[in-house]
Amino acid sequence: MDELLNITEENLRKILTTVRTTGSIDLIYYEPIILCHRIERFMQLNGYASAAMLVEKMMHDKKFADFFLERLRVSTTEMFRDPQMWKELEQNVFDKFRSESVIKIWVPDICGDDELNSLLVLLEKNSLLKKSMVYATCFFNSGLQEAANYEAESKKMEVGIDNYKKAFPDKSNLEDYFNKIDKSYIFSKKLLEQVIFIKHNIFTEAPPDMGFNLILFRNRALNYNLQTRKSCFERLYQSLLPGGFFVIGIGENLHGLDSSVRFMANSKTENIFKKL
């Protein structure tokens, strides 16, 4: 790998080795170029002038190693991102769930989590939430706690409201599912009661359950290396019911998967796939 910013191939190798022995999750599953960018950004924000300083700190402080790992993850940025996808989900997927007695949904590798809360709002709007079992998984306890106590500042809320109105101009207000305290919006605890939060390593552990009707996994795998992406997609495929839906997000694809993995496109523009 050529030198990228301050992170050389040797520096990256030292960081990976240190994280493997002191941290809670292995970085080998991530794309090296993306890792270099994220590490460089972390160093700039936290005042580390060299990789050696970063490695030294991690070697003597396991809590810092986990703090470092958490900060490398890419958080979701807004509710109802890509409004057309949510519209497609309501019109072409949720309608098929109305006859189900129980709807099982998995949102893996949460970080934030705007995706989870957008999903909960849409399920509630369509009177599907009460019969839904929504699994939200993350390797870090802090990520689970953040999602379980979601709040948005005014500017972030404005973006979510705008996205929501683009997708559903005739629906009720997004603010109806938040409590406003000063300048912050606290997400509805009532909706979050339907969520099963589980600490889970998507790279090494079996799915938290099987027989899912829907897996919402938009653009998380863009950060993974090719082999990890392939194995994750195949594992997620196995956990879906036949006829279940897999949402991977714009910019992703299903190329290179095992021939036993068979999907049909439910929406080519929004990358919503149906298991055959």
Predicted regions and their residues:
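Conserved SAM-binding loop of SAM-dependent methyltransferases across substrates and taxa
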Residues: 112-127
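Extended basic-aromatic, gly/pro-enriched interface segments that bind polyanionic ligands
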Residues: 132-211, 216, 220, 224, ...
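Conserved AdoMet
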Residues: 2-106
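Conserved class I S-adenosyl-L-methionine
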Residues: 100-115, 133-135
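Conserved beta-strand signature within the Rossmann-like core of class I S-adenosyl-L-methionine
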Residues: 242-250
